[in-house]
């Protein structure tokens, strides 16, 4: 056979290249991997190899060719808890696929799949089992009669296993799956394909041949399609003869680096450590690709998925004993491992490592905040931390459950683990519903309804007024033929002068009108190049086909144009003042302000903000004329045009150029000259997530109004402080100095009171077995003063001191404070201030915690203060007497 002449394929790269080469020779067009950020609004991430082809399968987009093949990077997080636990679950994986769009069907798909796995990958027939849908006799016959597989190797399964569908309605069809048998010696009787130790499914052939209507009836599709998927990691496990996917050359080099940092050996590690190693190895691949595709860590959407993955990596690093920052070192290995097939990883190397570093540092700080929140829960006197609270600590603060349980147990508090698991299951179900299905149905939503419309022609760059024809009217997302006065509508036109919200710029407002109708348009959105005009009918009736005119508000368009041009100038100024690597992470161009999000690990100083404002205003005064041209994307990038990181652009792009200042790819509206902006003012700068800063600014009339309001405020302050505007700074400084002096005097008086009070009781210490016990009530001191008194008493009494103070700071508030301070020798015999104070405070319906030598607590029941202090004294006397007996 020809397989004897073919080089043995083993490595992950060889498997991928062989697959693409094989189908390329079968006249399939090789399609590069799409981004992990899909064009499809119904899914958050690219979760399957076929997702980039979904519009083709639906007939909404022209097919790239009749046949296609790809190696598509994918991410799924719906089974994240199984990652590292099973041999084959991953968040990041590569799906090899071959696709037919109305060309070949079952026979060729099966024949070529068999040729690939037996001739190219050289798998033995003895190791292959095939499954088919139990009603799909056609596929079963092809496998047995034409391929020659023995019927005992063909397993017929039901609809749940071998019938693919995108939803309750839409395209669907049977599928046939290829399984690898690791133990063929066990024979072919009573085969159970669910036996994960023996079988692994590695190639799925979907025969998309039916359309299912709402009644469940199946009818043949006009064009039958093929959609296949082969997991690269699974095929690597098979060909490299490994126990699991993680030990293949696709992931194991990352795991080896983790072992080096943790100073452990993978093969001699226990199961718990191996799971942590696998999780970090898997998540590393997901994280570097997400960041490279433009995702930044945040608390929303894709950003939250990225943040969660990074936090899991840090957590499992801690479980392995890694206490220092380590993720950038791991990520570098992942980048080096995959950059040949994904050059974007190399190009974005610095960005990836910086994002990971910042997020790791931030999470370590978050862990500290989580510990503080946990301390508050413990201090509240609760004897049980609810599952909801434990899950909040885990989900919001990234605080591991086992850490919550461990700390709670130190304070004799239980954690509702079952309740935590219930909350976790609720989240899992939400995740599955959001991320595991690819919707190919066409009914029921605005997203699908607009597919029937042609692209809206936008002619609003040169004119604000034009004629148009109504092509669609929506009421409550339902397509209707007409609408009447008073109704809120969504209108689709054949052409428009209204700018549709995109690129951060808000949609225009204005009117759509004719002689007998008027619609006030308050927003315009753009979806799939169809402009959606939202408005209210003020008079008349709208009908499909009606001729109307569009009239955009010129004043608001001018404001948006000024703010959009100002945004471009701001980005150039940021690059000049801070760093050339500054890039846009998001923006808002509204009528009254602009907002710009950008990558920066450090806050922007006041001096830098001043320089940025000065630079932008100098460009405004220089009166630069803008040049706007359409050109190919490659030409624009060669000329130095700035593109937003992670944004998708057509082959032809619009370039907005302020010569010598700024050049960007942009579809927004702009002024003709920079002097039209008038002035520019930054009103705020803040961090919004790890490594991302936000600037809000004003231009034009909004900036002038801001200056006017500030001037009025200065005049009001001048009147209030009885000082001229130029004397305000000196006047406020003097007032601050006076306030500081007054506070010092007050604190001095508090310290004197505290000194007097603790001096009056320090001689009342009781000696028990050589230890000095001082338990007393001191009222009228705040927390700081009570703490100071306890520490001074401990210092006075020495290493064998045991000081417990309780008091009422203010009788009107009816709250108690407790402080426990122990000398070194008291700690050595086993006393723990944190545990002791918790028991004392509970008597008064309170709680607290702290370190072995010092702790503080709060409580509510002031009537039981004496009982609490008596308990403390009796407990110490018994404990020390017991220590004496020993």
UniProtKB/Swiss-Prot annotation:
InterPro entries: aa-tRNA-synth_II/BPL/LPL, Ala-tRNA-lgiase_IIc, Ala-tRNA-ligase_IIc_anticod-bd, Ala-tRNA-synth_IIc_core, Ala-tRNA-synth_IIc_N, Ala-tRNA_ligase, Ala_tRNA_ligase_euk/bac, DHHA1_dom. Gene3D superfamilies: 2.40.30.130, 3.10.310.40, 3.30.54.20, 6.10.250.550, Bira Bifunctional Protein, Domain 2, Threonyl-trna Synthetase, Chain A, domain 2. Keywords: Aminoacyl-tRNA synthetase, ATP-binding, Cytoplasm, Ligase, Metal-binding, Nucleotide-binding, Protein biosynthesis, RNA-binding, tRNA-binding, Zinc. The keyword Membrane does not apply. GO terms for molecular function: alanine-tRNA ligase activity; aminoacyl-tRNA deacylase activity; ATP binding; tRNA binding; zinc ion binding. It is an enzyme of class 6 (ligase). It is found in: Cytoplasm. It catalyses: tRNA(Ala) + L-alanine + ATP = L-alanyl-tRNA(Ala) + AMP + diphosphate. Binds 1 zinc ion per subunit. Zn(2+) binds at residues 564, 568, 666, 670. One of its GO terms (cellular component) is cytosol. Its main location: cytoplasm. SUPFAM superfamilies: Class II aaRS and biotin synthetases (SSF55681), Putative anticodon-binding domain of alanyl-tRNA synthetase (AlaRS) (SSF101353), ThrRS/AlaRS common domain (SSF55186), Translation proteins (SSF50447). GO terms for biological process: alanyl-tRNA aminoacylation. Its EC number is 6.1.1.7. Catalyzes the attachment of alanine to tRNA(Ala) in a two-step reaction: alanine is first activated by ATP to form Ala-AMP and then transferred to the acceptor end of tRNA(Ala). Also edits incorrectly charged Ser-tRNA(Ala) and Gly-tRNA(Ala) via its editing domain. Consists of three domains; the N-terminal catalytic domain, the editing domain and the C-terminal C-Ala domain. The editing domain removes incorrectly charged amino acids, while the C-Ala domain, along with tRNA(Ala), serves as a bridge to cooperatively bring together the editing and aminoacylation centers thus stimulating deacylation of misacylated tRNAs. Belongs to the class-II aminoacyl-tRNA synthetase family. HAMAP family: Ala_tRNA_synth_B. This is Alanine--tRNA ligase. The gene is alaS.
